[in-house]
Every structure is written in C-alpha cells, then in structure tokens.
C-alpha cells in the first residue's frame, strides 16, 4: 500500500512510518520541521520526507493519506487529498486496520505512566522470547526506537491515549485499538483542552474498557479511585494491583531492599501467594507500580516469574523519562516529560530518593495544553514544593489558552516563595542557563521538565558547565576515532556501538575523553577508557569510569569486568575492583569481540550487588 503521512517527523508519526516500512508498505510523508534525529532515522529506513506542506506532495497518488490530530480540515494537504478523492484516515484507524485486528493487543492506558509501562511490557515480552510488536509514544532505551514489528498475529503492545483522534473523528484514540489485555494505571483530569471535567475523562475510559472482550483482562491500579470507577464498566476479568499492603489488591508489591545506583528489590504476591522477587532500576514508588502491572500482564500472557524478572532487571528506561542527559562539574542534568502536577510530584519524589545528597533544582516550561491553563495553578505549587529551587519559563504559545484561563508563572513563583521554596521566573532559556551555570554546585541535580525541546536547554547547560560526560552521538565519531587512535585502542564498528559509549566534551564540544560500557546479560564490560594526553591528571578518567558504572547499575548489571595493563591499582583503590582469573569470567563477556581482542593485562571484576 502507498501511504502518505502528514507531519511525518513527529514522534508518533515517525514511529508509525518505521512500522509501516517494516511491514513492506511504500511510505512517504511531509513536515515543516525536518531535522535530526527523526529526519535521519527516516532517511536511514529509505523513507522520503518532503520539506514543507503543499498539494504537489501528493502527486505520487498514495492509496491513503494519514492525518494527525494536529491537522485541521483546512490544512493544505488535507484539502488537496479531498480534491483528488484520496482516502483520508487517522493514525489510530490505520494502526487498527493493518496491525491490531488479528493479534493480541496489550494496551497500556491511564493518565500517567503509559510510556514507561508500555516500554517495559514490550521489553519483558521480547526478553522472554515472545517476539512482540509495539508502537510507543517514546523511545525505550533498550530498543532505541519507538516501534517494532514482531511475530505476525502475536502480541502488539500499544500506548493507549485518550486524546481525540482527528478533526473528522473526535473519539479517543484508544477506541480503535481492539484491546485484549489492558493496563489502566490511573484516571485523573488531563487534556483540559478537550475534557471539561473528570467525569468526561472517566466516561471516555469507561467506554474504552467496555471494549475488552469477555475473555480479555483488565489490570487496574487499586490506588486510583478514578480507575476503579472506570473498571466497573468492564465485562472481562479484572485484577487490581498496589504497592504495599495499605490497599487491598490482587497483586501486591513490597520493597525489601535498596541497592547501589538506586535499584529496588521487591517481592510480589498474588492473592497472598508468593510470585517471585524482582529487581528494578526504575526509581520511585510509582515505577514499582508500573513494574507490578507489567508482571500481572505478562503472567496473564504465560510468562514465568523468572522470565519476567530477567526483563524487568535489564530494562533501561525510556528517553525523556528521568533520563540522565549528562554530568558536568558534578552537576547531573536530567530530562523529564512531566507536565501534569501528579507527574511532577512523583518525579521529584523519585529523584530525591535517587540523588538525595544534593539539591534538586526543577526547571519547568508550561508547554502542554494542560500546563498552559490555570486549572492546575494551585496544584503545581503543591507539586513543586519538594524541590529546593524552581526556575519557571514563560508559557509556551500563551495565545493557545484564553487570557482568563491562562497559567501564571509569576503567581506560581510567589506561591512557592510563600512556602519557603526558592522560585524565580525567567524570560529566556539563555538566562536560565546562565543562572544555573553560576549557582549549581557539585552534587546538585537539575531536572528539566517540559513536553517539548525547551530550546535545547539541556545541551546548552552541559556545554556551559564544561567537561560534560554525556552519551555519544554521531557528531562525536571523528573525535572518538582520533582519541582512540592516539590511545592505541581498537574499537571495531564504532558507529554501530555509539549507544554503548559515553564521551567527555570540553566547553568547545571537543571530545577529550571516552569510555564504553557493553552489557551482556547480567554482566558489563568496561572498555575503551581514554583521555587526551593534555588533560591527564585532572581526574577525567575517574569521572568517565564512575559514569559508566552508574549506567551499568541502572541497566541491571550485577558485575562489571575490565582488562587493564597499567591501571589495576587505580581501579582497585577508586572503585573496589578485584583481580579474577579469566576462566571465571561470564561466558558472554569472554565471547565478546572487545574482550577477545585483549591478549594481555590484568582481568578485574566489580560486584555491583555488594
């Protein structure tokens, strides 16, 4: 089928384009914001992207034109498609038509946690050998993209959104998703541009859960009154879940230990019977609830507790969900999508648990349709009150909210100061960066909260602070090759392993250090640690190794190996590595190209569980 996507560079549309291409459709599209990384990803898949919207973009006579909910009926390509009698459809309707009718749709729905929970569900199923398909509104770190085409007619994990579908279909998107198993994380007032009350939101969710067939399964959060009300409309089996014993539920998780790197060990029971012990690197009680819902769903799909446990342990999270963008001068910069007061509160609570030693500085951009309106003005003051300092940007496109119903940043700052919290408003991103560069200290965590790019604040701040340890990108390849060549270190297929590499950039964005952390099952291999000769003796090697070990902990490694010819004392004294015989090294590490490529040196191991 020939398929044209209007707005193809959006996160959702771009993922749909990749899924359609993998399914052997002829896919093209248009957009006004054609820039990396999405433009690069589409190009690499052989998908043509037309820059700008114009009637002639449809000259190739597609069989169907996909319209996003940001398109109005007078959009130039919509008008052109109708004039040419081309079929118009929506993203959800096409997904239903081509992928969801004949398989088992696992739909993750709710006001909060959809992206993380659906990403975790997809990874647990994949790690358990079930070969799922998925389409998710974010980028799971373990997959590197928001879509996957798995076994035909198998399980399809999809993030179920209650937002409206298109200008010609005002029903919620998830009405199209043919649900068989549903996770319902929470139901609160959100999307206030289309829902005027909590009752209206609940009505949409109630209609959705009523679509689950009698032999389906609804897994619902027992601590969400709105979700429990909605569950009464289900005709299928309903199972509830909760963290802790305070609320009665079918599935219960109880934290039993905290480990290094913010990992949590927890036990799970189903109706009083022990199911298993699990370990996650996702921070916060709300993420334990997300894990528990996936355990319930995966169990319903036939996975064993051991299979589920392996997937949960190795899950690395989702981009823009408490994602560490880099560490510079001891300041950790975190990116988070939180823009609803509940999400803000839970994110700050989780970060306090993970980075409790220093200050938590929240930087907030009221950008979403919900956050730019005044309905949650008082709730934001309560939600942000647990941070040590709040920096507030102007409302993004304020004209999209009525003047009498518009969020007021100055009022929020005043309310927070009245609670004893440092709070300031800024008119420009560069002024926020300058303030943070002058005031943030080693040990502080800066969490940037926005549903958009926020003017590139993260990268600007890391660059301004200098000597930032960040994930490597395509623009670092030249500097990486030069650095590794100078250090006489070989790293084959460097461009294919960028996601395993961290780099340290100076204020001019030059690569002055690097390290790789390869993960093989429960074990990691620290390798390719190098710094520029001119910068040696400044502690850069320690910074890089510390960041790599932190990444290994967050991604579920139990132990990390390395081979060194000259630095065994350094790794023993600074991190606690111990010498080990090569015969005792994990088989997957022994078979890795990096380990096999080192013929001499001392082999060392660090136990991350101790």
Predicted segment positions?
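A short beta-loop-alpha structural element at the N-terminal edge
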Residues: 468-480
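ATP-dependent carboxylate-amine ligase
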Residues: 1-38, 43-49, 61, 65, ...
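A short, internal acetyl-CoA/4′-phosphopantetheine-binding micro-motif in the GNAT/acyltransferase core
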Residues: 529-536, 566
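Walker A (P-loop) phosphate-binding motif
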Residues: 5, 19, 91-140
């Amino acid at each position: 089928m020939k398929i044209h996507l209007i707005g193809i560079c959006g996160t959702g549309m771009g993922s749909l384009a990749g899924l359609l291409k993998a399914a052997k459709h002829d896919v093209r599209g248009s957009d006004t914001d054609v820039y990396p990384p999405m433009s690069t990803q589409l190009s690499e898949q052989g998908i043509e992207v037309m820059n700008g919207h114009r009637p002639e973009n449809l000259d190739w006579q597609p069989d169907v034109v996909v319209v996003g909910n940001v398109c109005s009926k007078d959009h130039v390509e919509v008008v052109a498609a109708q004039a040419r009698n081309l079929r118009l459809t929506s993203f959800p309707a096409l997904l239903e038509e081509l992928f969801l009718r004949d398989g088992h749709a696992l739909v993750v729905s709710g006001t909060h946690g959809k992206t993380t929970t659906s990403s975790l569900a997809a990874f647990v199923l994949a790690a358990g050998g079930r070969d799922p398909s998925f389409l998710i509104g974010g980028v799971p770190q373990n997959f590197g993209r928001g879509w996957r085409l798995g076994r035909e007619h198998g399980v399809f994990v999809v993030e179920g959104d209650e937002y409206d579908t298109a200008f010609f279909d005002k029903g919620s998107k998830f009405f199209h998703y043919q649900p068989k198993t549903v996770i319902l994380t929470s139901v609160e007032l959100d999307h206030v541009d289309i829902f005027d009350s909590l009752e209206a939101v609940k009505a949409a969710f109630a209609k959705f859960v009523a679509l689950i067939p009698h032999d389906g399964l609804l897994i619902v959060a027992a601590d969400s009154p709105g979700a429990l009300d909605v569950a009464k409309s289900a005709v299928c089996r309903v199972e509830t879940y909760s963290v802790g014993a305070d609320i009665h539920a079918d599935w219960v998780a109880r934290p039993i230990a905290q480990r290094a790197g913010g990992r949590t060990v927890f036990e799970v029971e189903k109706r009083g019977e022990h199911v298993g012990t699990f370990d996650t690197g996702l921070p916060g009680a709300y993420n334990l609830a997300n894990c528990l819902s996936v355990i319930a769903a995966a169990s319903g799909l036939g996975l064993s507790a051991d299979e589920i446990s392996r997937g949960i342990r190795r899950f690395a999270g989702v981009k823009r969900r408490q994602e560490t963008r880099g560490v510079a001068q001891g300041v950790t910069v975190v990116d988070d999508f939180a823009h609803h007061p509940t999400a803000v509160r839970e994110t700050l609570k989780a970060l306090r648990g993970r980075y409790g030693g220093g200050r938590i500085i929240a930087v907030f951009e009221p950008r979403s349709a919900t956050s730019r309106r005044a309905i949650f003005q008082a709730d934001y003051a309560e939600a942000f009150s647990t941070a040590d300092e709040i920096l507030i940007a102007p409302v993004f496109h304020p004209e999209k909210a009525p003047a009498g119903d518009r969020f007021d940043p100055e009022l929020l700052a005043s309310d927070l100061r009245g609670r004893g919290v440092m709070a300031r408003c800024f008119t420009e991103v560069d002024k926020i960066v300058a303030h943070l560069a002058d005031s943030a200290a080693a040990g502080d965590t800066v969490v940037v909260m926005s549903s958009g790019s926020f003017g590139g604040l993260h990268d600007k701040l890391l660059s301004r602070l200098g000597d930032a340890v960040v994930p490597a990108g395509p623009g670092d390849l030249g500097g990486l090759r030069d650095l590794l060549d100078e250090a006489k270190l070989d790293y084959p297929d460097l461009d294919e392993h960028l996601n395993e590499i961290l780099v340290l950039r100076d204020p001019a964005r030059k690569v002055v250090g690097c390290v790789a952390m390869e993960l093989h099952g429960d074990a990691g291999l620290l390798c390719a640690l190098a710094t520029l000769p001119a910068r040696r003796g400044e502690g850069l090697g320690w910074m890089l190794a510390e960041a790599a070990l932190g990444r290994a902990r967050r991604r579920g490694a139990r132990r990390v190996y390395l081979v060194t010819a000259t630095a065994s004392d350094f790794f023993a004294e600074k991190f606690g590595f111990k010498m080990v015989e090569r015969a005792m090294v994990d088989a997957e590490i022994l078979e890795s190209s990096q380990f096999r490529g080192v013929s001499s040196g001392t082999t060392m191991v660090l136990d991350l569980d101790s």
